[in-house]
From Swiss-Prot:
Name the UniProt record assigns to this protein: Protein FlbA
GO terms under biological process: bacterial-type flagellum organization
Record-linked SUPFAM superfamilies: Protein prenylyltransferase, UDP-Glycosyltransferase/glycogen phosphorylase
TPR repeat segments: 91-124, 159-192, 193-226, 228-260
Gene expressing this chain: flbA
InterPro entries, per database record: TPR-like_helical_dom_sf, TPR_rpt, Ycf3
Taxonomic superkingdom: Bacteria
Keywords annotated in UniProt: Bacterial flagellum biogenesis, Repeat, TPR repeat
Length: 596
């Protein structure tokens, strides 16, 4: 990217809404079936074109369809537009234009063209199916479900229609409806491997990993080379703590991927599995797959210049952008003291972070130029820039902060034992300590029980709140709410059903005021919770933590501890969905902590 382009991109980015930091997570693969440009779909279009009464239109439609068949999407686009200039109500031309633009990645324009075709064509079914797949790909499951339901009205016995509707319902956390759709479809099509696979993913969503494996096994019995089923069985085995078996399944899946995006997701999943096994060097090498262009959630960095690739940094001028989700930005900052040291006294560092983190990083690293990055979503893709940087010529290199993991953290043992690496505002720490003292005697324990971005697939990684009862009944403890987002229901449940008051700190937005959140974390005696943005802040400022984590959590790097934060004590659940033993162990440890 040129520097001129970077400035133009910065202006464009500033004009659009910042969608914020968001990490890439390995997930099940059971997506919408079908292809708008498949041989069957194009044959159907050809038949419709032949039925067109206007001979000249029929001839040009046939040429446009042939261009799609030859994957000459630019030509198909041009021919469709010419037809629409003559007759803007020609539904087949809109359909061809939609397909051409979908295939070139112009999703927003494609969506509009599909909608025009849907309004004009008498046979709505195929267009509704194409629209549903595009909406699903653009992470619009509610819209996708409507179009897939429309498609099924036209083709009620179609395997593709049942599968696609079930996938959309799963993404909407409507698992029981998805199961009913799949059960009916399997009754009529018991040999359809894709339906067994999708049923397995629905069970994964609700935390039944063991049950899901039965369905993935059946899918693979019917279709031994079905890569999605291998990948998804790997995912289920991770939930059960079977990491070696998960790696074998993941590598089997990579031998015959169904699409470039499937392969990219499998490669990223393999990277995290290697890390979970403690094969850290191999894992970081494979972790580069997080930026694969084939991953729709992977950011496209709008940053000019040379990306750093291991060169000596002594005396160099470096620009770094943080990456992944908010918690990852904090976690990877574990390396910043080492990077500053590598640059030396004559070097210079400019650091782009999520804007809410800027005050905390400025205080901790006063010699570093801290700026805000900005992330936008456009036509189904994610773009990240540092729009407030104007002079790019001063930098020798730029890097994503994760680029330093292979060299600075090649093993779990390479992590420093420093208790804290971010510095909260001492005045605000004192303020919160004074507020906490007013609550009476006993240790002040911060609680975190969920993530803000919590679809059903991620929800299985968190214990239901009612299972916190043995922890909340620990005598002599004052509980402090650190949970951001809507948590009134859980706090009311604790008070009304369990008789436990969880103190709500006043004058702080637990989602937006992250500098003050870091100070509050530093003021409490202990934090208990799952890995989310706030618990990473607590670890970064050195607060003792009881962290609840899954058996295959890759961030433990194959250890029984948490290399990123020495203050963390891990409580590992052997299987998602079976939290009671883990919560019991946390309750016992908290009683011991309160008594000490």
């Amino acid at each position: 990217m040129s520097r001129k382009s970077a400035l133009e991109s910065s202006a464009s980015v500033l004009a659009q809404a910042d969608v914020g930091a968001s990490g890439i997570h390995p997930s099940v693969i059971a997506d919408a079936m079908g292809d708008s440009a498949s041989a069957e779909a194009l044959e159907r279009l050809n038949r419709a074109a032949q039925d067109t009464k206007n001979v000249d239109n029929a001839k040009h439609l046939a040429r446009a369809i042939q261009a799609v068949q030859l994957q000459d999407y630019a030509k198909a686009d041009k021919l469709a537009l010419k037809l629409l200039e003559k007759d803007e109500r020609l539904g087949l031309a809109w359909h061809i234009l939609a397909i051409a633009r979908e295939k070139t990645g112009d999703f927003a324009s494609s969506l509009r063209a599909y909608e025009a075709a849907l309004a004009l064509l008498p046979d709505h079914g195929p267009v509704a199916g194409d629209l549903g797949r595009l909406a699903f790909r653009m992470n619009m499951p509610e819209l996708a479900a409507k179009f897939f339901a429309h498609y099924r009205l036209a083709r009620p016995d179609d395997v593709e229609g049942a599968n696609n509707l079930a996938c959309a319902l799963r993404e909407l956390n409507r698992e029981s409806e998805a199961i009913e759709v799949l059960k009916a479809a399997l009754g009529a099509n018991p040999e359809a491997a894709v339906l067994w696979n999708t049923l397995g993913t629905v069970l994964c969503n609700i935390g039944d990993a063991a049950g899901s494996i039965v369905f993935f096994d059946e899918s693979l019995r019917l279709a031994p080379d079905f890569s999605k089923a291998y990948h998804n069985r790997a995912f289920a085995r991770l939930d059960l703590g079977e990491i070696e078996a998960a790696l074998a399944d993941c590598e089997a899946a990579m031998r015959s991927p169904g699409s470039p995006e499937d392969l990219a997701m499998m490669q990223f999943a393999r990277a995290t599995i290697l890390l979970a096994l403690g094969r850290v060097g191999e894992g970081w090498e494979a972790y580069e797959s997080r930026f694969s262009p084939a991953l729709s959630d992977a950011p496209r960095f709008q940053i000019p210049g040379v990306r750093w690739s291991g060169q000596d940094l002594r005396g160099k001028r470096l620009m770094i952008t943080t990456e992944q989700g908010l918690g990852d930005e904090v976690m990877f900052a574990n390396m910043l003291p080492d990077i500053v040291e590598a640059l030396g006294p004559d070097g210079f560092l400019s650091l782009a972070v999520e804007r809410r983190l800027a005050p905390l990083f400025e205080r901790t690293f006063p010699k570093v130029e801290v700026t805000a990055h900005r992330t936008i979503a456009y036509e189904g893709r994610v773009f990240r820039a540092a729009p407030y940087i104007e002079n790019w010529d001063r930098f020798d290199y730029w890097a994503a902060i994760g680029d330093f993991l292979p060299s600075l953290r090649p093993t779990a043992e390479a992590f420093p034992k420093r208790n804290a690496f971010l510095q909260p505002d001492p005045a605000r720490v004192a303020h919160w300590k004074a507020q906490l003292e007013k609550l009476g005697p006993g240790p002040k324990v911060g609680l975190l029980w969920k993530s803000l971005k919590l679809n059903a697939e991620r929800a299985r990684q968190f214990s239901p709140f009612h299972l916190w009862e043995p922890v909340l009944h620990t005598p002599g403890v004052v509980f402090v709410n650190l949970q951001y987002g809507d948590c009134e229901e859980e706090i009311a449940f604790a008070k009304e059903e369990l008789g436990v008051e969880i103190w709500q700190p006043e004058g702080i937005d637990l989602k937006a005021d992250l500098d003050d959140v870091a100070a509050l974390c530093a003021a409490v005696d202990l934090v208990i919770g799952f890995s989310n943005a706030t618990i990473n802040l607590a670890g970064a400022v050195g607060t003792p933590i009881f962290m609840l984590t899954g058996a295959s959590s890759w961030t433990r790097l194959g250890t029984e501890y948490y290399p990123w934060y020495p203050s963390v004590r891990c409580f590992v659940t052997e299987q998602y969905g079976v939290w009671e033993p883990t919560m019991g162990r946390v309750a016992t440890a908290l009683r011991d902590f309160a008594a000490s």
